[in-house]
Amino acid sequence: MKHLLGLRELSKEDIIKILNLAKDMKTILKSETKKTPHLQGYSVVTLFYENSTRTRTSFELAAKFMSANTTSISVQTSSVQKGESLLDTVKTLEALKTDVLIVRHAVSGVPHFIAKNCSFSVINAGDGMNEHPTQALLDMFTIRERLGTIERLKIAIIGDIFHSRVARSNIWGLSKFDNQITVFGPQTLIPPYIENFAYVASSLEEAVSGKDVVIDLRIQLERQKRGFITSKQEYYKFYGLNEDIMRYISGSTLIMHPGPVNRGVEISSEVLQLPNSTIDEQVTNGIAVRMAVLYLCTRKEGIYR
């Protein structure tokens, strides 16, 4: 497995292999030392052109727990601020003997561009509105761990579908396992082509009723200057997960969110604290999944053919 650029190009068997290995990695996380030599001698670099807490820290911990040499580049203090191009930046990292680059960028397709122009492995940590493959993988891992399967489930994805790379990766991944996927959100935030891949519900009540999993998405407030929603208060009233809407959701239905959470906008604090809320579990599972991805990307034999 040379790269992980997206779930669209992975097979069902590829995903299962990653999830199975992540289960083994989680056993390591539960040990007292949380340490394995699998990446000893490897150089792992994180290059984030967008802000991140969970993904960046999770990747860095995953690499360190596997004994890699890790470096985190702050774009704000790098030569990017002097006008250095993306290509020159990654070519510099190649000359510095990087083995794995974990990259996040606001422009879709950047990880694919880097993979075509450099010799090291590339892991996509989020590219524009395209994909966020490791977030979807950790979501799938969490679902399988809680429910025992990721096949033939009824899954709702609620919120800002239009801008969400998390939604796209989850749809690409979950659709390979014969799941019924429903989406719902403001009409301005539902892509016109989404009906080819998921059922579009007409109300929040319809969207969440009878579901095994509800994935709530972050409203990307940094994009709201374009007027996709009228106000945060109105969004919460019609699309937020609160105590009233929980009447339509079973106590066994998983409530998921990729984070960061805008409390009182997408979801209430009370719902976040329910036993069927998996948000903290998702963060922990993210380390195990990213350990698995790093392991596979540094092995000559792999799942990419």
UniProtKB/Swiss-Prot annotation:
GO terms for biological process: 'de novo' pyrimidine nucleobase biosynthetic process; 'de novo' UMP biosynthetic process; amino acid metabolic process. It is an enzyme of class 2 (transferase). Its EC number is 2.1.3.2. The keyword Transit peptide does not apply. The keyword tRNA-binding does not apply. It catalyses: carbamoyl phosphate + L-aspartate = N-carbamoyl-L-aspartate + phosphate + H(+). Catalyzes the condensation of carbamoyl phosphate and aspartate to form carbamoyl aspartate and inorganic phosphate, the committed step in the de novo pyrimidine nucleotide biosynthesis pathway. Belongs to the aspartate/ornithine carbamoyltransferase superfamily. ATCase family. Heterododecamer (2C3:3R2) of six catalytic PyrB chains organized as two trimers (C3), and six regulatory PyrI chains organized as three dimers (R2). This is Aspartate carbamoyltransferase catalytic subunit. It comes from Caldicellulosiruptor bescii (strain ATCC BAA-1888 / DSM 6725 / KCTC 15123 / Z-1320) (Anaerocellum thermophilum). The gene is pyrB.
